[in-house]
């Protein structure tokens, strides 16, 4: 037996070599440059073994094959040439594995992503387990990169160019049965027989190249290929607006390999990898990755969290149903819902059932797994079953007296250790806790809608919240699959506070005569997932604007809504998508049509569209209001660090990820340039654009929000 730091070679009695991957001291297997020499030594040993019957690559980790390459390697590269050399080295190692004279099989259980899938693609065959943890994909585009160890060349030849482009451009991850159907794996087996199945396959003759489906063969021809690449390029630009350079480079590199041969393709792949690694977009996206990874390790306070055994939810509406769903399906904790009516209970239970049933229909979940997860959710119209709940999450109407009554009832019907977490979006947590007998166990836990999709939660302690309560609440959020940031107990907290001036400015542009389409398109081109006016329609115009008066009372006229536009819209019973009446037209259920603005809106607000601003000017006004408010929030300690502020904006409101978040973007622009731009806008449009004190101080001293030269955010002081 030969042993290395991460790769171990062992010969079986049947002369099948098993290469076990197990990076010491790490939960996840990741590929590092320093492993290259060890892997090459193993490959050399295998090549020289004349009795070798086959080779199996398998992981010793319980839930991952290889999660990808270590991204820190890129951070250490000082030039595109260094990053290109890194990719070339990876390509060469994969080529050496591929060139082994026997059948090489990848035995995959758990995450097989990025460089992990590229290693599996270098093998002649792949077998994976049928476990829910098993996922296969090339997610490098999400870091502003492309697969650099042969993935752009091997995947199209294995599954077809159309399927490969879909996977690589979207960073799409396939489940076992999807991978089998696509031809990415050759078999799906239970984990208990994975090694034996792979070893038996390895002893067989190497397979002939897979025959692609008819559609993929047609697209591989000159005419089909030209049409495909034209359509993919057009669709990609419509989606990215040129903000993500990796997308176009992926298309170009895949095409190069298909039209000029794999040698040219590999060369183009390595070169593109090196150049993309040096782009500001990749640096920003990798910065976000490191920031979220770092945040996952934190407990939110210096105290240790209490163990969680069960959870309660008050309210069976959209939010309550969503909170119960993620508690049962992600945290795998028993959850009890209380609502005042049977209708509310039925709604909450149906919410979870419908989502789980959809997963079953799509073969993402077995019916037995659906039933097991639904069994974790129970409900009643009284407090039976609440006595030993560790946390009760309140999701009732935004009414202070009602929420205070909920605190009193929970304290009366639960254990002394039970935490009361309010899902308020606007009410001060200190006010909710004002009459509590255990105020140290009252905290805010602000989810975003829809709960099953939005990754962020804000954890809001008031002045009297205990450190243990904070840590335990953060722990629950993580178990629910959320990214929690701890924010201060003040009006709007963080996310809604920076979102409000952004939406207000969009409404001001509307009142000045700019069309709804032009405003939304300007911000989508800037990189937001939807425009600010469409966002109002999506979240509900009544809900989205309810917080505006609260913010204006707390922070003054810079939060005042423009004119009576919102009142006129609401008075016409326009609440957005949820009631089919908003700024946009919504077709009857079941009918699809292109998104269109409702022209009647202009008459309601007394505006004739015909503004003179460019899209860039509209985007600048809206984004600058958000950035200025974000800087204020950091200065006031609303967020603990620039890191938390960036994560909150990207995951909470869809701030363009390629910019890295508002604080990294302000660093890119520079504090002095920010102050100059805001002063110019203040001169033209009013005092609401006046640069905040923090930016003015930083402009004088040359400070940045993120410490220069690394990915660490400056903490507030």
Swiss-Prot record:
UniProt-listed Pfam families: 3HCDH (PF00725), 3HCDH_N (PF02737), ECH_1 (PF00378)
Stretch list, region 3-hydroxyacyl-CoA dehydrogenase: 306-717
Segments of this protein annotated with the region Enoyl-CoA hydratase: 1-190
Gene3D superfamilies: 1.10.1040.50, 2-enoyl-CoA Hydratase, Chain A, domain 1, NAD(P)-binding Rossmann-like Domain
Keyword Iron-sulfur among UniProt keywords: no
Entry annotated with the keyword tRNA-binding: no
Positions bearing the site annotation: Important for catalytic activity: 118, 140
Catalysed reactions, semicolon-separated: a (3S)-3-hydroxyacyl-CoA = a (2E)-enoyl-CoA + H2O; a 4-saturated-(3S)-3-hydroxyacyl-CoA = a (3E)-enoyl-CoA + H2O; a (3S)-3-hydroxyacyl-CoA + NAD(+) = a 3-oxoacyl-CoA + NADH + H(+); (3S)-3-hydroxybutanoyl-CoA = (3R)-3-hydroxybutanoyl-CoA
Domain of life: Bacteria
Keywords from the UniProt entry: Cytoplasm, Fatty acid metabolism, Isomerase, Lipid degradation, Lipid metabolism, Lyase, Multifunctional enzyme, NAD, Oxidoreductase
Subcellular localization(s) per the UniProt record: Cytoplasm
Gene Ontology molecular-function annotations: 3-hydroxybutyryl-CoA epimerase activity; enoyl-CoA hydratase activity; long-chain-3-hydroxyacyl-CoA dehydrogenase activity; NAD+ binding
Record-listed E.C. numbers: 4.2.1.17, 5.1.2.3, 1.1.1.35
GO CC term (a single one): cytoplasm
UniProt cross-references to HAMAP family, sorted A to Z: FadJ (MF_01617)
Function according to Swiss-Prot or TrEMBL: Catalyzes the formation of a hydroxyacyl-CoA by addition of water on enoyl-CoA. Also exhibits 3-hydroxyacyl-CoA epimerase and 3-hydroxyacyl-CoA dehydrogenase activities.
Complexes and interactors: Heterotetramer of two alpha chains (FadJ) and two beta chains (FadI).
Family: In the N-terminal section; belongs to the enoyl-CoA hydratase/isomerase family.
Name of protein: Fatty acid oxidation complex subunit alpha
Organism: Cronobacter sakazakii (strain ATCC BAA-894) (Enterobacter sakazakii)
């Amino acid at each position: 037996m030969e042993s290395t730091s991460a790769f171990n070679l062992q010969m079986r009695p049947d002369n099948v070599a098993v290469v076990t991957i197990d990076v010491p001291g790490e939960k996840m297997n990741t590929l590092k440059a320093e492993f290259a020499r060890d892997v090459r030594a193993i490959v050399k040993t295998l090549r020289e073994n004349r009795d070798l019957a086959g080779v199996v690559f398998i992981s010793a980790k319980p839930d991952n094959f290889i999660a990808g390459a270590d991204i820190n390697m890129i951070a250490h590269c000082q030039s595109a040439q260094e990053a290109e050399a890194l990719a070339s080295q990876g390509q060469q190692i994969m080529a050496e594995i591929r060139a082994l004279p026997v059948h090489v099989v990848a035995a995959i259980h758990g995450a097989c992503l990025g460089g992990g899938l590229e290693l599996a693609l270098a093998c002649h065959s792949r077998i994976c387990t049928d476990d829910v943890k098993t996922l296969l994909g090339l997610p490098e585009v999400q870091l502003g990169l492309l697969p650099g160890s042969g993935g752009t060349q091997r995947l199209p030849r294995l599954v077809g160019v159309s399927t490969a482009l879909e996977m690589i451009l979207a960073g799409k991850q396939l489940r076992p049965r999807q991978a089998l159907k696509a031809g990415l794996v050759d078999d799906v087996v239970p984990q208990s027989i994975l090694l034996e199945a792979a070893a038996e396959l390895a002893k067989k003759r190497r397979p002939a190249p897979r025959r692609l489906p008819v559609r993929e063969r047609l697209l591989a021809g000159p005419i089909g290929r030209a049409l495909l690449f034209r359509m993919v390029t057009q669709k990609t630009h419509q989606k990215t607006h040129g903000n993500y350079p990796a997308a176009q480079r992926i298309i170009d590199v895949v095409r190069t390999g298909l039209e000029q041969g794999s040698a040219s393709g590999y060369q183009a792949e390595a070169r593109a990898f090196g150049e993309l690694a040096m782009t500001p977009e990749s640096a920003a996206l990798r910065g976000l990755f490191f920031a979220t990874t770092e945040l996952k390790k934190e407990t939110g306070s210096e105290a240790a969290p209490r163990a969680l055994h069960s959870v309660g939810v008050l309210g069976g509406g959209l939010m309550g149903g969503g909170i119960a769903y993620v508690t049962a399906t992600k945290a795998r904790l028993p959850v009890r819902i209380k609502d005042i009516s049977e209708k509310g209970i039925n709604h909450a239970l149906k919410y979870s059932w419908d989502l789980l049933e959809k997963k079953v229909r799509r073969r993402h979940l077995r019916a037995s797994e659906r039933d097991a997860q639904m069994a974790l959710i129970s409900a009643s119209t009284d407090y039976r079953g609440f006595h030993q709940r560790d946390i009760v999450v309140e999701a009732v109407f935004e009414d202070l007296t009602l929420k205070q009554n909920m605190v009193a009832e929970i304290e009366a019907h639960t254990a002394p250790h039970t935490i009361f977490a309010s899902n308020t979006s606007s009410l001060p947590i200190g006010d909710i806790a004002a009459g509590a007998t255990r105020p140290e166990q009252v905290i805010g836990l602000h989810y975003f809608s829809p709960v099953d999709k939005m990754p962020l939660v804000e954890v809001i302690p008031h002045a009297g919240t205990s450190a243990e309560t904070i840590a335990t609440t953060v722990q629950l959020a993580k178990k629910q699959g959320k990214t929690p940031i701890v924010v201060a107990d003040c009006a709007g907290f963080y996310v809604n506070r920076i979102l409000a001036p952004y939406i207000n400015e969009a409404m001001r542009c509307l009142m000045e005569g700019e069309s709804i389409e032009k405003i939304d398109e300007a911000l989508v081109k800037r990189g937001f997932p939807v425009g600010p006016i469409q966002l109002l329609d999506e979240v509900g115009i009544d809900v989205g604007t309810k917080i505006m008066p609260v913010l204006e009372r707390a922070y003054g006229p810079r939060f005042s809504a423009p004119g009576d536009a919102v009142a006129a819209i609401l008075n016409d019973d326009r609440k957005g998508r949820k009631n089919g009446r908003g700024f946009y037209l919504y077709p009857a259920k079941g009918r699809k049509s292109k998104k269109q603005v409702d022209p009647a809106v202009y008459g309601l607000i007394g505006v004739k569209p015909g503004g003179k601003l460019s899209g860039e000017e509209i985007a600048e006004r809206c984004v600058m209001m958000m950035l200025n408010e974000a800087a204020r929030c950091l200065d006031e300690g609303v967020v603990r660090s620039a890191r938390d502020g960036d994560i909150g904006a990207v995951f909470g409101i869809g701030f363009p990820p390629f910019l890295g978040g508002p604080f990294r973007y302000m660093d890119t622009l520079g504090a002095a340039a920010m102050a100059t731009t805001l002063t110019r806008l203040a001169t033209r449009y009013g005092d609401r654009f006046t640069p905040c004190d923090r930016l003015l101080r930083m402009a004088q001293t040359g400070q940045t929000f993120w410490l220069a030269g690394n990915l660490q955010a400056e903490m507030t002081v």
